[in-house]
From Swiss-Prot:
[4Fe-4S] cluster binds at C352, C413, C416. Pathway: Amino-acid biosynthesis; L-leucine biosynthesis; L-leucine from 3-methyl-2-oxobutanoate: step 2/4. This is 3-isopropylmalate dehydratase large subunit. Coiled coil: none annotated. Its cofactor is [4Fe-4S] cluster. The lineage of its organism: Bacteria, Pseudomonadati, Pseudomonadota, Betaproteobacteria, Neisseriales.
Length: 472
């Protein structure tokens, strides 16, 4: 047999059939469900007189619309009636149909679906994982074939446990070398996107490999795969190694005893074979990656903290030049401004990209013994799940943040997107650990700069972006 990539192995092990035009029917192992993209799917099933084909594939939680404060008010704390209805509808639907696991609003295990799935052991190596959310690529950190689907596809998976798709091309992103102190997986992700652009991965499944990737924790690998979609890729992947196995073992839905041993024997094969051929290869030197900060309205508009805001006049492509000019106008920035001189109004540490325990530890290490700058109106930390929150509080991280003038919130998607009460006001500038800096993403007229948790925390203390490698 010819040498296979990890993507080849995952794809071929789930193909039910392939039509002459190349369209395949894929079996889906795990279906993650939240309140925003599931109501129409459940309603479609009811209208057709169907029920979910395999309810034990479903893991559900409320995350996008849930408030991160005023939990004492219960469901009434969700002020927007549409948001409240979506949360209530998810609750009614899942209680009626059943699921492998359901973590409703205010449950101790509730949180962002892409944090909850892995921490519960519901995401396992070798699985196909789908969710009505674009950042489902997160789960590829476990060598799972994971990608987002649309609302109609959510219904299709519920009804048939299968999905039609065409095989992507395979891209290898190899990152070799040791990262500098203060440089994280978020910086790798932004550096990759800065290199290949937001369309560079279109039509590909990206496998991340190399010594720098092997040196990442599972939290770091999830951050990296989470951002693969921002490079245009369908999926992000990291091969199984001992780090993967150590993370999964003992989690609530992970196999045990003899089943664990059998699973591990299979999982250890989830890596690209020696000599496997990729359709594209991108190589980065980890030692040269500096802390990254986005300056525009796309993740590809990113530079090192030591750089300046780019000048559109230096861009030869007229389309790109116009895009840069529009971005600078929206962001209220002037070409040539040092990134370290850009002041921020708000700081957000959270989202499915950077709200896990490692992320909070990194941010807390920066703010310990310091105080938020008076010029920063709000600095908020939103754990990715109730379990992350409990673990952080057991370590005293909440007290570190509160002592520094930060707000310590309840779990949820929060300020990643303007779909709940946490949002920017027009003109406000935010250092954010989320994944998208589009116009209006965090609130109409809001200006988003994507950074790592440590960089966000440092900006809150200084009142502007700083090089985390110097004095923090």
């Amino acid at each position: 047999m010819a040498a296979q990539t990890l993507y080849d192995k995952l794809w071929e092990s789930h193909v039910v059939r392939t039509d002459p035009d190349g369209t395949s029917l894929l079996y889906i192992d795990r279906h993650l469900v939240h309140e925003v993209t599931s109501p129409q799917a459940f309603e479609g099933l009811k209208l057709a007189g169907r029920k979910p084909w395999r309810v034990h594939s479903i893991v559900a939680t409320a995350d996008h619309n849930t408030p991160t404060d005023n939990w004492d008010l219960g469901i009434a704390g969700i002020k927007d009636p549409v948001s409240r209805l979506q949360v209530e509808t998810l609750d009614a639907n899942v209680r009626e149909t059943g699921a492998l696991a359901y973590f409703p609003f205010m449950d101790r295990n509730q949180g962002i679906v892409h944090v909850v799935g892995p921490e519960q052991g519901a995401t396992l190596p070798g699985m196909t994982v789908v969710c009505g959310d674009s950042h489902t690529s997160t789960h590829g950190a476990f060598a799972a074939l994971a990608h987002g689907i649309g609302t109609s596809e959510v219904e299709h998976v519920m009804a048939t446990q299968c999905l039609t798709a065409k095989k992507s091309k395979a891209m290898l992103v190899r990152v070799e070398g040791e990262l500098q102190a203060g440089v994280t997986a978020k910086d790798i992700a932004l550096a990759v996107i800065g290199r290949i652009g937001t369309a560079g991965g279109t039509g590909y499944a990206i496998e991340f490999a190399g010594s720098a990737i092997r040196g990442l924790s599972m939290e770091g690998r999830m951050t990296l795969c989470n951002m693969a979609i921002e490079a245009g890729a369908r999926s992000g992947l990291v091969a199984v190694d001992q780090v993967t196995l150590d993370y999964v073992k003992g989690r609530p839905f992970a196999p045990t005893a003899e089943q664990w041993e059998a699973a591990v024997a299979c999982w250890r094969e989830l890596k690209s074979d020696e000599g496997a051929v990729f359709d594209a290869v991108v190589e980065l030197d980890a030692t040269t990656i500096a802390p990254q900060v986005t300056w525009g309205t796309s993740p590809e508009m990113v530079v090192a903290i030591t750089d300046r805001v780019p000048d559109p006049a230096a861009e030869a492509d007229p389309v790109k030049r116009e895009g840069m000019q529009r971005a600078l106008a929206y962001m209220g920035l002037t070409a040539g401004t040092p990134m370290a001189e850009i002041a921020v109004d708000k700081v957000f540490v959270g989202s499915c990209t950077n709200s896990r325990i490692e992320d909070l530890r990194e941010a807390a290490a920066v703010v310990r013994g310091r105080r938020k700058a008076d010029s920063v109106r709000l600095a908020m930390v939103v754990p990715g799940s109730g379990n992350v929150k409990a673990e952080a509080e057991a370590e005293g991280l909440d007290k570190i943040f509160v002592a520094a003038g930060f707000e310590w919130r309840e779990p949820g998607c929060s300020m990643c997107l303007a779909m709940n009460a946490d949002r920017l006001e027009p003109g406000e500038r935010c250092a954010s650990t989320s994944n998208r800096n589009f116009e209006g993403r965090q609130g109409q007229g809001g200006r988003t700069h994507l950074v790592s948790p440590a960089m966000a925390a440092a900006a809150a203390i200084a009142g502007h972006f700083v090089d985390i490698r110097k004095g923090y």
